[in-house]
């Protein structure tokens, strides 16, 4: 549809709904007068501790992103940890992330190397899961992306996050590049089961840690960077030798002696194991079917929108690189530098949760009124 045809179509829709030509022109003038100040119309909210410091987006930045989205017919959105930091889920690489304290996540090699490593992983996951599963909710970034998808502006959505907050917000056909903490896989037989069911089994086998999990679930969320601070923790969590610091994948630090005695069940399907969260650990490989699906999305996209990601992992970066090599424009919305910056035709360094709702409004205005 040409620009002229689109404008005529929007005007005919307005007339059909009872808006007179004079009223239509008056509405356009009113919106034009409001446009420079429009961004403040989106309700503000308290910024979580896990989100980096960042100024709100300007009207020009919002319009540029809205134009980028509106011009695309097959927009591929790739999201990362920066989307979920505004849901109080910390990341690894930001100044406030887990790496800032020297924390090292469990690698695939460590997980497979020894039974005691797997016990430690599952003990930490057990204690932290209740808070992660019950208190973590989608934020306005997730909601805006889901709305953009429903309204036909997002062709494919690939996320590097393992929290399933896109699903909770209503996004469909989400490709989880690095898997999800909400499922458990048996490395012997391949059976996939629910993480919630696993939690119930772990509770039955380890009743002595239930109180610690409950205490941590009710404790104020703290950053990994606050570990050495004297800020208050839940007395119950401290007494249980459990750190109240939130970790990126929903786990928590516990005393090594308690982890050593933690009981992990065998696979309910084959009786063997080991059981592992269906997550691509550091040092692991993305499953071939996921690689194929992601590659097809990159090849079919006419534009790529990176949101809340530094795309530092090659599994995500190659999708952007290959699409850009075929001529697809790239927009980046994230607070900080990214590996894709040299490829970007548009870069906006803002928080996704404070920017995308405004972009959604701008896209809707553009669809209805042509600007």
Give the residues covered by each predicted segment.
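Conserved catalytic core of sirtuin-type NAD+-dependent deacylases
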Residues: 2-371
């Amino acid at each position: 549809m040409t620009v002229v045809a689109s404008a005529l179509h929007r005007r005919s829709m307005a007339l059909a709904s009872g808006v007179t030509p004079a009223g239509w022109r008056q509405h356009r003038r009113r919106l034009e007068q409001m446009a420079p100040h429009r961004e403040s119309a989106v309700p503000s909210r308290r910024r979580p501790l896990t989100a980096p410091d960042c100024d709100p987006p300007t009207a020009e930045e919002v319009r540029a992103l809205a134009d980028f989205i509106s011009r695309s017919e097959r927009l591929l959105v790739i999201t990362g940890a920066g989307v979920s930091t505004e849901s109080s889920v910390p990341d690894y690489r930001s100044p406030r992330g887990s790496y800032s304290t020297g924390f090292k996540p469990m690698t695939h090699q460590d997980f497979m190397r020894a039974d005691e490593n797997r016990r430690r992983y599952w003990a930490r996951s057990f204690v932290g899961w209740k808070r992660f599963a019950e208190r973590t909710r989608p934020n306005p970034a997730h909601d805006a992306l889901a709305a953009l998808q429903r309204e036909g502006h997002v062709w494919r959505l690939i996320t590097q996050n393992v929290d399933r907050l896109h699903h909770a917000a209503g996004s469909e056909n989400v490709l989880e590049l690095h898997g999800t903490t909400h499922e458990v896989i048996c490395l012997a037989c391949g059976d996939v089961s629910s993480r919630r069911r696993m939690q119930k089994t772990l509770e039955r086998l380890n009743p002595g840690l239930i109180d610690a999990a409950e205490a941590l679930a009710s404790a104020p969320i703290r950053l990994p960077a606050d570990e050495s601070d004297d800020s208050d923790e839940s007395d119950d969590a401290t007494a249980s030798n459990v750190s109240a610091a939130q970790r990126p994948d929903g786990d928590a630090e516990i005393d090594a002696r308690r982890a050593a005695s933690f009981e992990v069940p065998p696979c309910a399907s084959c009786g063997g194991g080991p059981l592992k969260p269906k997550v691509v650990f550091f040092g692991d490989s993305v499953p071939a079917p996921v690689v194929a699906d992601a590659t097809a999305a990159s090849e079919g996209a006419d534009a790529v929108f990176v949101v809340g990601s530094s795309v530092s992992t090659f599994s995500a970066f190659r999708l952007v690189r290959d699409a850009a090599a075929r001529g697809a424009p790239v927009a980046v919305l994230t607070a900080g530098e990214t590996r894709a910056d040299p490829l970007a035709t548009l870069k906006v360094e803002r928080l996704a949760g404070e920017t995308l709702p405004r972009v959604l409004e701008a896209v809707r205005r553009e669809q209805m009124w042509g600007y």
